[in-house]
Amino acid sequence: MARVKRAMNARKKHKKILKLSKGYFGGKSRLFKTANESVIRALRNAYTGRKLKKRDYRKLWIARINAATRANGLSYSRFMNGLKLAGIDMNRKMLSEIAINDPKAFSELVEAAKKQLNA
């Protein structure tokens, strides 16, 4: 079997990893093995973070909507149920933006939800 010399491939791989680890402290930015471990961990954490970000924003929107609905005398779950019954199809991001930037319009949405719940 012929001998495989990996000079170019290995160099390319090492350069890629060391470029990704630029800015890391100490050997993590200079030594291939530790840099590779750090880069793998960083990429894994970045992937996880992108998934967690979606959950965190949803939690934030729900907390904001809940605070605004309670200020208008209704709980979050009853408000969402009332909106569904009223046929108002709005996502939580938009509802939270309205609650922050236009409280008057948000209180109208709460009234519409209350009306449907009482009917």
From Swiss-Prot:
Gene3D superfamilies in the record: 6.10.160.10, Ribosomal protein L20
PROSITE patterns in the cross-refs: RIBOSOMAL_L20
GO biological-process terms attached to the record: ribosomal large subunit assembly; translation
GO MF terms held by the record: rRNA binding; structural constituent of ribosome
Keyword check for Ribonucleoprotein: yes
Keywords for the protein's UniProt record, in alphabetical order: Ribonucleoprotein, Ribosomal protein, RNA-binding, rRNA-binding
One Pfam family of this chain: Ribosomal_L20
Keyword Ribonucleoprotein recorded: yes
Origin superkingdom: Bacteria
One cellular component (GO) term of this entry: ribosome
Annotated signal peptide: none
Function recorded in the entry: Binds directly to 23S ribosomal RNA and is necessary for the in vitro assembly process of the 50S ribosomal subunit. It is not involved in the protein synthesizing functions of that subunit.
Family: Belongs to the bacterial ribosomal protein bL20 family.
Name by which UniProt lists this protein: Large ribosomal subunit protein bL20
Protein species of origin: Clostridium tetani (strain Massachusetts / E88)
Upper classification of the organism: Bacteria, Bacillati, Bacillota, Clostridia, Eubacteriales
